[in-house]
Regions:
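Anionic coordination/interaction segments
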Residues: 1-342
Length: 342
């Protein structure tokens, strides 16, 4: 079966999310994160890992990328956001994903609740592969595309900046930021990683990365590698301590801008809990206005939502019988009478 898909957009910044938590982020005509059409494995997107430091057990806030069976799991799609509810080993996670209508950013808010009767110490680790290039160019030669991406860690803001160096004088520069903010709770120092090899490790995948294995040396911090790396990623880790019944909210924010100054301005803005809160309200208002502008009902929106999976992923079940296809002798203009541009 094809993945269920939800699309979130403000017209410039676009996010696709599947029911398992995979997907992509795009800005204008650029791929922000790496993605390949793979309806079976679906291992691409922006992810968040949770690890119990006392036991070494880890899982993700959605089914992807760890593929571990949760005690309870629910994916909820609405016009303005995507939600995931999950329970693992008496730890509840509730994730909301939305795109801001006023800035080119996506907000992933995760509320983590300790439902056990003991104090828990957890690692929260974000992860995404950064591209900032045309999707076709990255798909043809990803290793070459990676050579132009440079990363910079900003410890004072708990953020990572990435930029794509221009290949010629006429090429514009693009900037990306990746931020993790803990709301109302001090977790100590954050750690960072921008080298995929050091995060995943040799012979591993995103379901069992090297970075999620407890260190025998006792240090669980990421390496802090930055600069011109061969395979750029963005990953931030924070440690949280939760008493029984206690909750903490983690905001993971990513976005794009044309200059470094604008990017730092967005980082500063979305570290503020009140400004981040506005994203969900604005996204809901934007989705309602969009439906009204195109004269669509909620029933129409639900129909489009069911069809979008077959647009993003090739659906062989919709292909007609080969004998009928062979009989067709019309060109693209034959579609115009059905209001299809082709």
């Amino acid at each position: 079966p094809l993945p269920e898909v939800q699309l979130l957009s403000n017209g410039r910044y676009h996010v696709m999310v599947t029911q398992a938590g995979g997907g992509y982020s795009r800005w204008k005509d650029l791929a922000v994160t790496r993605w390949r059409e793979d309806a079976t494995r679906d291992p691409w997107g922006m992810f968040c890992y949770i690890r119990d430091i006392s036991t070494g057990e880890y899982w993700s806030t959605a089914y992807q990328p760890t593929l571990k069976q949760p005690d309870r799991y629910e994916a909820i799609f609405s016009d303005s956001k995507v939600e995931f509810r999950r329970r693992d080993d008496d730890i509840n996670t509730y994730t909301q994903i939305a795109v801001s209508p006023e800035d080119d950013i996506e907000l992933r808010r995760i509320r983590i609740t300790n439902r056990s009767r003991k104090r828990r110490e957890l690692d929260v680790t974000s992860y995404a592969e950064i591209v900032m290039a045309q999707p076709a160019a990255d798909e043809i030669h990803p290793a070459f595309s990676n050579l132009f991406v440079q990363t910079e860690i900003i410890p004072d803001h708990q953020a990572i900046l990435s930029t794509r160096r221009p290949r010629s004088e006429n090429d514009p520069a693009y900037w990306n930021f990746h931020l993790m903010a803990l709301q109302g709770k001090d977790s100590g120092e954050a750690s960072y990683e921008t080298d995929r090899l050091k995060f995943v490790g040799r012979g591993n995948t995103l379901s069992n990365p090297q970075a999620m294995k407890l260190s025998v040396e006792g240090s669980n911090a990421l390496s802090g590698t930055e600069g011109s790396v061969l395979d750029p990623v963005v990953s931030i880790r924070r440690t949280i301590r939760l008493a029984p019944g206690e909750s903490v909210t983690v905001d993971i924010v990513s976005g794009m801008a044309e200059t470094r100054a604008k990017t730092l301005g967005l980082v500063e803005k979305y570290r503020d809990r009140r400004l981040a809160d506005r994203v969900f309200n604005l996204a809901w208002t934007h989705s309602e206005l969009t439906l009204r502008q195109i004269n669509a009902t909620q029933a129409d929106a639900q129909l489009y939502g069911r069809l979008v999976g077959s647009v993003v992923y090739a659906n062989a079940s919709l292909r007609t019988d080969p004998k009928i296809i062979v009989k067709n002798h019309r060109g693209q203009s034959g579609l115009w009478g059905y209001a299809i541009s082709g």
